[in-house]
Swiss-Prot record:
Part of the ABC transporter complex MetNIQ involved in methionine import. Responsible for energy coupling to the transport system. ATP binds at residues 38-45. It is a peripheral membrane protein. Transmembrane segments: none annotated. InterPro entries: AAA+_ATPase, ABC_transporter-like_ATP-bd, ABC_transporter-like_CS, ACT-like_dom_sf, MetN_ABC, MetN_ABC_transporter-like, NIL_domain, P-loop_NTPase. Residues 2-241 form the ABC transporter domain. Its EC number is 7.4.2.11. It is found in: Cell inner membrane. SUPFAM superfamilies: ACT-like, P-loop containing nucleoside triphosphate hydrolases. This is Methionine import ATP-binding protein MetN.
Length: 344
């Protein structure tokens, strides 16, 4: 559905050119929810605006539904953009227009008749749960409801792609969950491809199928969300995952284990479980089979896209050969095992 090929974006700066994007290549499948995450200044918003050419990249190609947008003239690009809806952190609603009229605006600009507008807007208001608020003005509704108006407006032209640029960043946690549930519903019912730009790993965890991690304008890691959580490779990814699932041991735990490490018998590991392994007694089986003592230092159980995910930090005590055999057994059962050598 979306192919980004070698995108680079340079802007003039006070001390020379600023490289906002550096050779970014991504493939986003039709009908998936794809997340792009990164810290402030990583290039996320520049990238999402390159997808619909609000920012024309300095080099590279943007292909949407088989069409190279970078090769289109102004008229053809304007038509192609109707296939791409967009929602923002700030709702950009017209205060003088009602909820209904804000959603109808792009259809009015496209020259649609009142009957055509009504046949599109009314089902959209039903979809986003705003039918009863159709005659209210933006000042009379909540932030979450304003974002629902923004979503309905973005869908009015019946796009194939929806771009979300930090659309939940200004919302409280409960409203954020409701908006994310709505986006999942839209993705499921309309088959819409959604690209989520966010700095919140919690958003990625809740709704995205795959994710790309952006740092200094480059993609440093990408893959299925569950795989990235299980095996984060880049330090930026590990730090951002740590915001929602603790990866580092608490200081109080470090103090307890500090005196025992280095004796050759005590080893600290991080174990990650997913799917069926969360419910299976694989750790107990490893203890029984290899005669080890295990001490659970820290743990967390969560859910990623409806799939159970667990993380444990343990201290294994025993002969080194037995400890390694136990870890090999856990890996054979699908558990991700990482020895924490820098614990102190």
């Amino acid at each position: 559905m979306i192919e980004l090929q070698g995108l680079s974006q340079r802007f003039p700066g006070g001390s020379g050119e600023v490289h906002a994007l550096r050779d970014v290549s991504l493939s986003i499948a039709s009908g998936e929810i794809f997340g792009i995450i990164g810290r402030s200044g990583a290039g996320k918003s520049t990238l999402v605006r390159a997808i619909n050419l609000l920012n024309r990249p300095t080099s590279g190609r943007v292909i949407v539904a088989g069409q190279d947008l970078t090769a289109l003239d102004k008229g053809a690009l304007r038509e192609a953009r109707r296939e791409i809806g967009m929602i923002f952190q700030h709702f950009n609603l017209l205060s003088s227009r009602t909820v209904y009229d804000n959603v109808a605006l792009p259809l009015e600009l496209a020259g649609k008749s009142k009957q055509e507008i009504a046949s599109t807007v009314e089902p959209l208001l039903e979809l986003v749960g705003l039918s009863k608020l159709r005659d209210r003005y933006p000042a009379q509704i909540s932030g979450g409801q304003k974002q629902r108006v923004g979503i309905a407006r973005a869908l009015a032209s019946k796009p194939k792609v929806l771009l979300s640029d930090e659309a939940t960043s200004a919302l409280d946690p409960e409203t954020t969950r409701a908006i994310l549930d709505l986006l999942k519903q839209i993705n499921r019912e309309l088959g819409l491809t959604i690209v989520m730009i966010t700095h919140q790993m919690e958003v990625i965890k809740q709704v995205c199928d795959r994710v790309a991690v952006l740092e200094a304008g480059q993609v440093v890691e990408s893959g299925r969300v569950i795989d990235v959580f299980l095996r984060p490779q880049h330090e930026v990814t590990r730090a951002m995952i740590g915001d929602v699932i603790a990866q580092e041991l608490p200081v109080s735990v470090l103090k307890r284990v500090e005196s025992r490490l280095g004796n050759g018998r005590d080893h600290v590991y991080r174990l990650a479980f997913t799917g069926e392994n969360v419910d299976q007694p694989v750790l107990a089986q490893a203890i029984r089979q290899h005669g080890l003592d295990f001490n659970i230092l820290h743990g967390h159980i969560d859910e990623i896209q409806g799939q159970a995910f667990g993380s444990l930090a343990i201290m294994a005590t025993g002969e080194l050969a037995d400890v390694r055999a136990a870890m090999d057994y856990l890996q054979s059962q699908g558990v991700v095992v990482e020895e924490i050598e820098h614990v102190v």
